[in-house]
Amino acid sequence: MQKVRVHEIALELGIKSKEIIDKAKDLDLDLKTASSALPQEEAAELVNYILTGKSSRLKPAAPAAPMPKEEEISPAPQEESQMEPKEEPQKEVKESVKEAPESLPESPKEEAFEAEIPKESVKVTPKTLEQEPPKEELVSIEPSLESASETLSDSNPLPQEKTETKETIVATTLATQTDAEIQESEEKKETLAQATVQKRVGLRIVKKRSEEPAPKADRPSLEEARTPSRTAGLKTLQSLLGESDESEAALARKKKKEKKKPLPAPTKKNEQKIDLLGDRALETVSSFDDEQEEIVLFDLTIRDDINKEDEVAKKVDTDRIKVQRKTPFLDQGIRRVKRRKRRPQTVADKESISGTIEIPEEIRAYEFAEKTGKSIGEVIKVLFNLGLMITKNDFLDRDSIEILAEELELDVVIKNTSEALEYTSEEEEDEDEEGLEERPPVVTIMGHVDHGKTSLLDKIRNTKVAAGEAGGITQHIGAYTVEKDGKKISFIDTPGHEAFTEMRARGAEVTDIVIIVIAADDGVKQQTIEALNHAKAANVPIIIALNKVDKPDANPDKVKAEAADLGYSPLEWGGEYEFVHISAKTGEGIDHLLETILVQSELLELKANPEKAAKAVVIESSLEKGKGPVATVIVQSGTLKVGDSIVADTAYGRVRALIDDCGKNIQSIGPSEVAVVTGLSETPMAGAVLVSVENDSIAREYAEKRALYLRQKELSRSTKVSFDELSAMVAEGQLKSLPVIIKADTQGSLEAIRGSLEKLRNEEVKINIIHAGVGGITESDVVLAGASDNSVILGFNVRPTGSVKNRAKELGVEVKTYSIIYALLDDVRAVLGGMMSPVLEEENTGQAEVRETFTIAKVGTIAGCLVTDGSIQRGIKVRLIRNGVVVFTGNIASLKRFKDDAREVSKGYECGIMLEGFNDVQVGDVFETYKEVEKARKL
């Protein structure tokens, strides 16, 4: 049976565990501590006894029925004489402690005393007990008596003695009751009711139990009350208290204190002392009614009221917080939307909505709803029906806006909103013809990898850049300025590797003339075609340089034929493209190439205004130690000076230094000139437009606006999904992924690596790029990689420091560094291949022909075979082939040579074979054994 602990009962009733233990002793329940347990039935009986004072387990105190023995009470006069001096100073204490303790234990115990008193006195008892025992003669004795008995019970005294004392007092009370005392007891009943109510659930106890010193002072009175007979006891009490002036003074003080006693203020919100009985007369109230009151009158209503007050207070606090702390998050809440919906539409609004509405090209769904006067629900519903799932904060593209306008029957005009974010728009005004000056041409060298682009530029500049390139291939855009016949030419060298498509496209965009380098001994290759397409898309003049003509196997005519097939015919063949024969090794044709460039630039009439605010294009950017973010730029118009405030996409700052291609510090650069800029807040994206503005605050404002816009756009893109894309996204989540962190030396290289890695995927594996950045490998990168399972850090032209290596070793993170991009891609491709599930390939091990069959009862069919090829092994996989058709595929259950089990039988020997779960073997069948071999797949 489940048991209940004392502290649980105390918690339920709102009283102390100690009081419950005291009450349990009246029912002969042996409870010692708050952790003591008792069965549920006894617990229910105990709770009922505490609340009502009634119990079927309450036994009459048998030893207390006869009168006390003479020898037990004989010490009373002695104790009285010894302790009498202490009675006077304790009177005030007794009266102050009187109220609550006096009445708490009375009502339950009186039930027991009714059974103990002889029948002749029972006639008087009910009336008396209903109206409470306190009397005029017992004003100073009874509280002390109660305190003493409680103290004795706490210290485990003899229960016999306490019961006898109680009975003696009750008997004395019956004998001395007067009409005045009855009236006094009615006043006292109110105190009893209050004390009883205080013990209910949810009500606090106003006063504690009697203090410790009080019982000591009360002992003389207690012993005096123990007289040999009732008559003697009556005389003793009368002699002590009846004619005493002090007792009358104490009674007067007690009455005065009862009238003036204020209700103590509640210390907790859920506790309140209430006067349940008021000033009602109690003569007509029966004991049963009082007990009903005790059971029914809980303070639930008061607690409810308190809870309501708390809720109101909380609501007030919340409202105050909303007013005081106004944040953009609160503006996006439900309340704001509701207020907007309730706002009545003015006549002006209706007129504007009915006409043509200007809608920005980049607009969120809820903003579209506001501008068109439609609800956001209508907008989302239309797009939902068309298979596009969006939220109210998602951006709408041009197609979605047009569809919505058609579906909702609106006349809208889409305008380009990015003008507000375009810091370059102010610079793109019509240039004043008077301020224009001739500028040098910007020439981009493009072509296939290893066709000699950088070597050609080295020969023009008389440097050795190519020799310093890792693997002999260019992996960054390089910008240089050379002088020919007093005229400057700016060259941009682009990588030829397939991974650097973006760089080549960027180089073609900012250029005036493109030189396509083709090796005369190799011909037109994939990247050559791509470079030609980039140049054609940029609508710039193309000069084709046939390099390596000094080689013995060079065939320029073959290259011209291949170019003509692509639509690039040479001038001598009636085409429009200049083909120049050069050799980067010997210098042959270099001057002719430069002259061709200058002639072409004169035809283009390249001009710019150097007095305007500078506008440049970021060719490459990187993070350099000691300099911070740096960007290689080529100026398109105006003049960029040291100290100018600049902004490039989300990066901003002030030009701290300008470094030319020779490494010298310069003060300014004009149109078509190249330099490295330092002083930016972050590395700008390659291809970003850099402009100079009036001051730093304007630059900062442009950059922050654009950063916020791009972030919102990215978040919006991540939430939008169509039904068709949904299944693809689910499948994407089930792919195995290799988490990588990429760190590169320049922004262009980073883009190239990122783009190449994202292409390395199939239906089973993919690359998950956790983080990609420009700069060295740091400890934070290692910690980030450590937080992801099986993450790898890939460094390109960067190296980790000693502390970073140690940290990576601690966290078990693999750091790989490369200087050649195709080595990086090959390694990643190999890792992805290992992640893919292996391919199972079959390898034939042997063949046997059935010559005879034997059927054995309870065993099966055994085939007598001759091994014709390889060897037959026990337990290996086997196919049964009959007339060229596979009849059964399974395992060999038993392999025997004559009567002995064999592990393997080689070619030319006979053996007996039994198949696992197949007996339909016929003469002439062929057994073909094989094993499955796992082989790693390649991406």
From Swiss-Prot:
Residues 146-158, 170-180 have a biased composition (Polar residues). It is found in: Cytoplasm. Residues 472-476 are annotated as: G2. Residues 57-274 are annotated as: Disordered. GO terms for cellular component: cytosol. Residues 447-454 are annotated as: G1. Residues 83-122, 129-138, 208-227 have a biased composition (Basic and acidic residues). GTP binds at residues 447-454, 493-497, 547-550. Keywords: Cytoplasm, GTP-binding, Initiation factor, Nucleotide-binding, Protein biosynthesis. It comes from the Bacteria. Residues 493-496 are annotated as: G3. Residues 438-607 form the tr-type G domain. Residues 583-585 are annotated as: G5. Residues 547-550 are annotated as: G4. Residues 252-262 have a biased composition (Basic residues). Signal peptide: none annotated. One of its GO terms (molecular function) is GTPase activity. Belongs to the TRAFAC class translation factor GTPase superfamily. Classic translation factor GTPase family. IF-2 subfamily. One of the essential components for the initiation of protein synthesis. Protects formylmethionyl-tRNA from spontaneous hydrolysis and promotes its binding to the 30S ribosomal subunits. Also involved in the hydrolysis of GTP during the formation of the 70S ribosomal complex. PANTHER family: TR-TYPE G DOMAIN-CONTAINING PROTEIN (PTHR43381:SF5), TRANSLATION INITIATION FACTOR IF-2-RELATED (PTHR43381). This is Translation initiation factor IF-2. It comes from Wolinella succinogenes (strain ATCC 29543 / DSM 1740 / CCUG 13145 / JCM 31913 / LMG 7466 / NCTC 11488 / FDC 602W) (Vibrio succinogenes). The lineage of its organism: Bacteria, Pseudomonadati, Campylobacterota, Epsilonproteobacteria, Campylobacterales. The gene is infB.
